[in-house]
Curated annotation (Swiss-Prot):
Keywords: Ribonucleoprotein, Ribosomal protein, RNA-binding, rRNA-binding. One of its GO terms (molecular function) is rRNA binding. The lineage of its organism: Bacteria, Bacillati, Bacillota, Bacilli, Lactobacillales. One of the primary rRNA binding proteins, it binds directly to 16S rRNA where it helps nucleate assembly of the platform of the 30S subunit by binding and bridging several RNA helices of the 16S rRNA. The gene is rpsO. Pfam families: Ribosomal_S15 (PF00312). This is Small ribosomal subunit protein uS15.
Length: 89
């Protein structure tokens, strides 16, 4: 359920803080959110796929940790990101 290279490059370009930025929390969270959304769609069609469900839970946990880090480091960047991604409805 990996995202395509074009989609990944588009997300990196949109959320990067500067040229060549692939490791900032914003980029990592955006990529994880895309993966999580794809896995959710996959699991709706394949309810018995328990292995993918475990992978989904790991990705959600990783994103949660990155969001907590960003919230503690810079609350304004955190708020902008969750609004942009549509998290925390």
């Amino acid at each position: 359920m990996a995202i395509s290279k074009e989609k990944k490059d588009e997300l990196i370009k949109e959320y990067a803080r500067h040229d060549g930025d692939t490791g900032s929390p914003e980029v990592q969270i955006a990529l994880l959110t895309s993966d999580i959304n794809n896995l959710n769609a996959h699991l709706k069609a394949n309810k018995q796929d328990h292995h993918s469900y475990v992978g989904l839970l790991k990705k959600i946990g990783h994103r949660r940790n990155l969001l907590r880090y960003l919230k503690n480091k810079d609350i304004q960047r955190y708020r902008d990101l969750i609004n942009k991604l549509g998290l925390r409805r």
